[in-house]
Amino acid sequence: QISASVKSDGGIRFIGRAGVGVDNIDIGEATNKGITVCNTPGASTRSVVELTIGHLIASTRHIATADRTLRNGEWAKKQLRGSEIGGKRLGLIGFGRIARGVAAIASSFGMEVHAFDPFVDEAPEGVQLHDDVDEIFRYCTHISVHCNLNEQTRNLVNFERISLMPGIGLDGIECGNHIVS
């Protein structure tokens, strides 16, 4: 949090964003005040890819819940039976650097990988591109969202789309504003 006095005294010359999204920065106001704004695309790609795969495995295997119940003295083995991700269908919304990394690892686990990105014409072998984002929700058991937040992607994930899914599994949400709660 930057205080109002710091903003108004002209001391800020540069705002650096560790990551891609700059939707939380008023670029117009920064430009008017002569403040340079930059982001760091690619700097944390591998970390986000690994975290996304970690969330995918943790959610399908109920790792966090199992940890909590075990710490509370319960052994809930039967209630927390997870499933393997191999053979499941992963839908990637957005197919840039992060999603491509997720696709490569998910494929190595035996997942069937599908992607939607209106700006991508070709996908690597083993990834099926779709022209309609609703197809991803209809067909895939797990969804991972990896696109910049803008007016076209705000509230992209909503009740209607989630209700299309054969099973529920949302992962890799880079920004919660993609989801309508």
Regions from the language model: what does each represent?
Residues A18-V22, G42-T45, F119, I136:
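Short, acidic/turn-prone active-site loops that include or flank metal/cofactor-
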Residues G11-D26, S163-S181:
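ADP-ribose/adenylate-binding Rossmann-like module
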